[in-house]
UniProtKB/Swiss-Prot annotation:
Alphabetized UniProt keyword annotations: Lyase, Magnesium, Manganese, Metal-binding, Riboflavin biosynthesis
One of the record's GO molecular function terms: 3,4-dihydroxy-2-butanone-4-phosphate synthase activity
GO CC, one annotated term: cytosol
Protein's recorded name: 3,4-dihydroxy-2-butanone 4-phosphate synthase
């Protein structure tokens, strides 16, 4: 990727990651780009612990509509969330579990407020499987152990960022789309970030940062 296009968000991987961590600490979203040879997409990511209905509404409005809750394997086991399919043959092995809905406190489950309630229910310290109904309107994703050092995906990036910011290891993500419904690529993501004031970093930035600091 041409790094100069990302210079408004930091001249080095370290700067971009630190800016993103700081944004997360303040409960703000960040935009994460993956490799151009992979999905070549940008996801808007919020810490699950602090996401608001207003932020969820932005994900729904500007994203693909598939809002995902990225969580650890340990959390998936705590909630008894099996994989969506027995044999995952998707290109990037995206680890969807069955979809979820909060058992209490929601109406249809599809509104921004309802999806936030579902997320808050799922990441509660004392959450148990019966706190959730299946299926639902939130799509959990199981992050690979080791984060982006194991798998260079948006799922792992969101969990890593949450951990580095001092939050529970859970992030809420959605792919950003253009007004015509096509996927937003790097130039589109940069313009989107400038318009709304988001930090931008790449998954490779996060890999480089973690390796440099052994974290």
């Amino acid at each position: 990727m041409n790094q100069s296009i990302l210079s408004p968000f930091g001249n080095t991987a370290e700067e971009r990651v630190l800016n993103a961590i700081n944004a997360f600490k303040n409960g703000n979203g960040v935009l994460v780009l993956d490799d151009e040879d992979r999905e070549n997409e940008g996801d808007l990511i919020f810490p699950a612990e602090t996401i608001t209905p207003e932020q969820m509404a932005k994900l729904i409005r500007y994203g693909s509509g598939i809002v995902c809750l990225c969580i650890t394997d340990e959390r998936c086991q705590q909630l008894d969330l099996p994989s969506m399919v027995e044999h995952n043959n998707s290109v990037n092995k995206t680890a969807f579990t069955v979809t979820i809905e909060a058992a209490k406190g929601v109406s249809t489950g599809v509104s921004a407020a309802d999806r936030v309630t579902t997320i808050q229910t799922a990441i509660a310290d004392n959450a148990v499987p019966t706190d959730l109904h299946r299926p639902g309107h939130v799509f959990p994703l199981r992050a690979a152990n080791g984060g982006v050092l194991t798998r260079r995906g948006h799922t792992e990036a969101s969990v890593d960022l949450a951990r580095l910011a001092g939050f529970k290891e859970a992030g809420v993500i959605c792919e950003i789309t253009n007004d015509d419904g096509t996927m937003a690529r790097t130039p589109d993501i940069v313009e989107f970030a400038k318009k709304f004031g988001y930090s931008v970093l790449t998954i490779e930035d996060l890999v480089e940062y973690r390796l440099a600091h052994n974290i």
